Amino acid sequence: MEMNRRNLLKGSVAMGAAGLVASKAAVAAVPAKWDETVDIVVIGSGFAGLAAAIEAKKAGSNVIVLEKMPTAGGNSIINGGILTATGCPQQKMHHIKDSVELLEHDILKAGNYMNDPKKVHEIASHALSNYEWCVNELGVEFLPDAIGQEGGHSVPRYVTTKNGSGSGIVLKELEMVKKLGVPIRLRTYVDHIVRSQENEGPVLGVVVHEGYRFPKAGSGKQKAIRARKGVILCYGGFSADVKFRTFQDPKLNATLDTTNQPGATSELWRETSAIGCLQVQNDWIQCGPWGNPKEKGMGIGWEYNQTAAAEYGLWVNQKGKR
């Protein structure tokens, strides 16, 4: 995990939401004048964005975090607070045999072997160090004797924050960000990611609207921020954007609710495509068969359904097939 976060700073732009490769596309004009210059611009204030900001600051960079919503945390702060932690003390307490190789196998199988094996290995091999970073660096408190099993996992291997929410991690990250003096710019909408005029040149910075009022497009004051070392993209998913998700998968239309926060929209997915990124498998959107359509957001019914089926039962479709 330490290696990954530091390696993010070596390139012009790093992507936290999806694997991307360069392609030809139009780019926004380079501003005649930069209003502000920093080393690193992090877009997004969830788990990944805050972790990147913390490590970049510790590595000696001048960092800012941009968040379009009025509060930090994104989907991360409202999620279930569970973390895959192969090799953690909770597994050892319950004498659970697990390994990085088994976790890799489970991830590849769940992805119909369409995953990038190198990325899967990175995720699996750093599962324990992620947990240790949360505990040792941030002081996150997980339930000390509880270990759970999600669907698709061969053995129980997830730990849960004491408060049962992603806020148990995000709030600790926010404390560390504040301690390190990293500013989080709320209500700051990224309008453009600026590359050099040569279409395949480096990312130079971003053009934003400060004082943005979600979801009012164009609200706020425009500002150009130069990033000397790079822009780290951690803006999350787009499941609250009905139009864009329906474009990816027509079945996911407005009749389907989402557990995502309202700001999980597609503008930066579209912007990264415009600057020459090729996004992959955008139509592979996770749906929760354990959810209750009569409950808003996650609700509480999933807690029984998930445990009953994933740990003690099995999933079947409408035709009764596993």
Which functions belong to the PLM regions below?
Residues W34-G46:
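Beta1/beta-strand and adjacent pyrophosphate-binding region of the FAD-binding site
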Residues G49:
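N-terminal Rossmann-fold NAD(P) dinucleotide-binding loop
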Residues N62-E67:
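Short beta-strand "acidic-cap" motif of Rossmann-like dinucleotide-binding folds
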Residues R213-G220, R226-K296:
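Glycine-rich loop(s) and the adjacent beta-strand/alpha-helix scaffold that form part
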